[in-house]
Amino acid sequence: MQKYVQSDYKHDPFHLFSTEHVVTLAIISLLAILLFLFQDEVKQPRASRFLRSLFVFLLLGSQIGYQIWMVATDRWSVRTSLPLQLSDLSVYLSAIMLVTKSRKLFVFLFFVGIGSSIQALATPDLGMFSFPHIRYILFFISHGSVFLSCLLMAVIGTYRMGQRSLWVTVLLVNVYGVCIFLIDRWLGANYMYLTKKPGGSSLLDVLGPWPWYIVSAEAITIASFFILYWLYRIFKK
């Protein structure tokens, strides 16, 4: 078992859309479908409290576990290990949202949390760490829980959302991106992949060279926000 927690993993590296990856995505998708199929049961106070508590535990537990693993294996670095990616930030904000039921956090995370978690789940930057390594397991628990937490709050909540909320979220993401770019320059880091593309396969590979892939990613982000907004309006009719 020790080999599944070591940083020098002697196993097949992670392959995008391998059998293990597809099965993991299928499990998360099935859980999402079950949330909607059993939404009347999920809305019951006892069930909703249990699910919110469960996801808070999974979100924080997976992130704390990841940070402990990074430190224990001497992989932790201020340039790579701070929770500054949008998907990582969404983990902590999702935990706060589940506890407080904040409308503002829900609106922000419905766009950013779902959008970033889908991208992270579909094109994870895992390098050599394939299933059943602890890095793989913690990664998918973390980002899968963000995705499912946002869907859970969409099901049990009565939040109203207009186009203004969409554009405020776009503005906040861009302001955050500028701050992260400055941090990247200061640390020599690559948070949010603003200075170069990630090493593994990702959507950015088809969006052109730096800095044009950032402009293309911005357009895709806005388009995806509109799709999520449209789906939410249909669901809440």
From Swiss-Prot:
Regions that span the bilayer: 16-36, 53-73, 80-100, 106-126, 137-157, 167-187, 212-232
Primary site of residence: membrane
Keyword line: Cell membrane, Membrane, Transmembrane, Transmembrane helix
Compartments reported by the entry: Cell membrane
Listed GO CC annotations: plasma membrane
Top-rank taxon, per record: Bacteria
Membrane-related topology note: Multi-pass membrane protein
Protein name in UniProt: Uncharacterized protein YwaF
Source organism of the structure: Bacillus subtilis (strain 168)
Gene name tied to this protein: ywaF
